[in-house]
């Protein structure tokens, strides 16, 4: 599976590689390894293409909407410029078409020789200045106890993700910490949460083909994979890119600052012992991270034997993932109580869910129609949404499709469905930046509602006597209190947290210790949503947009 729509340096002719790197360094005026919009407009202007053509070149090259071009994206842009100069229409399908991108000639850039010669002259002057020996200045040493603390300058915002990090630290995080959002909803975000690659989680009952699906996607086994008819995957396995093939225990993963799994420590050692990371070098894993989960059990007794909060872990991963695949087997369409709880825990992430009816070639066409109808009926009782969920039908493994059972029409259907699902997965890295913005805005709104609820409960507490009775009354009538908050601040009912979950967490706190409403904090988040984020998106949009 190819997930990248850009062209790597290794896919160019050797004589072109050095030239592209030289051009990239010229275009990258500040030397930060990124060609920003302003840099690109100056450099691309030498191609003499129209503004509309260059707008399309940028849109295709910056497929992930990062707001800048790295070396791979820059090479893609240069090849697209060359094709546009030859008269080709620039579309995203051009990279997937019949054109051999490796043999595309260098684009014609008028005036580039002058720019190269000027840069060489300036570099020579800098080297001469560096070779001049200057006498080092002696500065008076200040005792450490008299030195003033130095305020570090703010890091320049060079990507949309950098901007979101700054907005979170300056405006959203203070509100979350003040009103204990990390305890009631989601842990505090770290830098690694923003920088993480997009994730795809696979859910399903045992032996529905989750691990086999990942193997089929990668085209090979991955470390720690176990496949069989019995419940084989007994742990959460995160398959991600790494320099070599190895598995990393969950406790180690949870404490690594550069990994987005610090929040899993709240589920305790019992869960972390059932969590591991599988690393291997692979082009697919360079773009996305895959999360394999234990098979959902059918019996209540087996569920009670789990030593950790299974649905809580699923809910945590669901909030972090970009796509959730629910896998079903034609012979196991019944949705158990635990599976129902798991699907319910995905509340708020319905837009990420895709349903896969796997192993569909094990039944004939007539049975498949009945199975499909039964599956939709079962899902309709669990997924409380009026929209029809997307269902992919196929047999996602390395074996050839059983044409005897499904016939030639079924074979063609399965191939089209598989291509559609792979295309959906290919879009995940492209939409990752948009998804981060979407999740950030969703989180900000949830944090605001959490602050309104906490401050309202604080306001309902008596000043002196009867505090314990008042707290119990508020907890018993929590749904009614939510309604008061909704009416007072004109909030949508669908954005409020689960009453049962909130009541459960609230039982461990003293409401009287909560903070009163701080309008300045709320206003800061409103300004962030109304002004800062739109300005950030405007700054890193296509530089050729009017």
From Swiss-Prot:
Residues annotated as binding Ca(2+) 1 are: 28, 30, 32, 34, 39
Residues holding GTP: 204-211, 292-296, 359, 395-398
Chain positions covered by the region annotation G4 motif: 358-361
- What ranges does the record give for the region G2 motif, renumbered to this chain? 230-231
Per UniProt, the keywords (alphabetical) are: Calcium, Cell membrane, Coiled coil, Cytoplasm, Endocytosis, Endosome, GTP-binding, Hydrolase, Membrane, Metal-binding, Nucleotide-binding, Nucleus, Repeat
GO molecular function (one): calcium ion binding
Spell out the PROSITE patterns in the cross-references. Answer: EF_HAND_2, EH, G_DYNAMIN_2
Q: Which domain of life is it from?
A: Eukaryota
State the annotated membrane topology for this chain. Answer: Peripheral membrane protein
Instruction: Note the coiled coil stretches, chain numbering.
Output: 467-490
Report the catalytic activity: GTP + H2O = GDP + phosphate + H(+)
Residue ranges annotated for the EF-hand domain, each copy included: 15-50, 51-84
Where do the record's region annotations for G5 motif lie?
Answer: 382
Output this protein's name: EH domain-containing protein 2
Per the UniProt record, the source organism is Arabidopsis thaliana (Mouse-ear cress)
């Amino acid at each position: 599976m190819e997930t990248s729509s850009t062209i790597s340096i290794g896919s160019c002719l050797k004589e072109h590689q050095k030239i592209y790197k030289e051009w990239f360094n010229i275009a990258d005026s500040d030397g930060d390894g990124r060609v920003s919009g302003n840099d690109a407009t100056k450099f691309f202007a030498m191609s003499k293409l129209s503004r509309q053509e260059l707008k399309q070149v940028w849109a295709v090259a910056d497929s992930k909407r990062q707001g800048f071009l790295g070396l791979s994206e820059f090479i893609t842009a240069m090849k697209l410029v060359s094709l546009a100069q030859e008269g080709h229409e620039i579309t995203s399908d051009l990279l997937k078409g019949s054109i051999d991108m490796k043999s595309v000639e260098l684009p014609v850039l008028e005036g580039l020789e002058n720019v190269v010669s000027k840069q060489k002259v300036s570099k020579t002057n800098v080297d001469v200045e560096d070779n001049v020996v200057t006498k080092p200045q002696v500065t008076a040493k200040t005792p450490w106890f008299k030195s003033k603390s130095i305020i570090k300058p703010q890091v320049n915002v060079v990507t949309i993700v950098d901007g979101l990090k700054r907005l979170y630290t300056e405006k959203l995080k203070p509100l979350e910490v003040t009103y204990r959002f990390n305890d009631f909803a989601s842990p505090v975000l770290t830098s690694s949460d923003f920088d993480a690659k997009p994730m795809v989680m696979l859910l399903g009952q045992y032996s529905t083909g989750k691990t086999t699906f990942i193997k089929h996607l990668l085209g090979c086994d991955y470390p720690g994979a176990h496949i069989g008819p019995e419940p084989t995957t007994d742990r959460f396995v995160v398959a991600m890119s790494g320099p070599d093939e190895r598995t990393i225990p969950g406790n180690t993963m949870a404490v690594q600052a550069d990994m987005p799994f610090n929040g899993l420590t709240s589920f305790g050692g019992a869960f972390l012992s059932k969590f591991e990371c599988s690393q291997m070098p692979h082009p697919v894993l360079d773009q996305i991270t895959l999360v394999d989960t234990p098979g959902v059990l059918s019996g209540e007794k087996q569920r009670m034997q789990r030593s950790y909060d299974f649905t809580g872990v699923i809910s945590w991963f669901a909030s972090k993932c970009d796509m959730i695949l629910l896998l079903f087997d034609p012979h196991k369409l019944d949705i158990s109580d635990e599976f129902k709880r798991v699907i319910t825990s995905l509340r708020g992430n319905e837009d990420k869910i895709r349903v896969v009816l796997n192993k569909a070639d094990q039944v004939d066409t007539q049975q498949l129609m009945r199975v499909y109808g039964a599956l939709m009926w079962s899902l309709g009782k669990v997924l409380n949404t009026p929209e029809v969920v997307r269902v992919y039908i196929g047999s996602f493994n390395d074996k050839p499709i059983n044409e005897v059972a499904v016939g030639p029409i079924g074979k063609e259907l399965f191939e089209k469905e598989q291509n559609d699902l792979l295309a959906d997965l290919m879009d995940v890295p492209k939409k990752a930046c948009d998804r981060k913005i979407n999740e950030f805005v969703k989180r900000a709104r949830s944090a605001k509602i959490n602050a309104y609820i906490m401050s309202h409960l604080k306001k309902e507490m008596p000043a002196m006597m009867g505090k314990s009775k008042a707290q119990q009354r508020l907890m018993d009538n929590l749904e009614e209190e939510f309604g008061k908050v909704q009416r007072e601040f004109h909030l949508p009912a669908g954005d409020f947290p689960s009453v049962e979950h909130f009541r459960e967490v609230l039982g461990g706190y003293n409401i009287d210790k909560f903070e009163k409403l701080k309008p300045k904090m709320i206003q800061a988040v409103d300004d962030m949503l109304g002004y800062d984020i739109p300005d950030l998106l405007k700054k890193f949009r296509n530089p050729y947009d009017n």
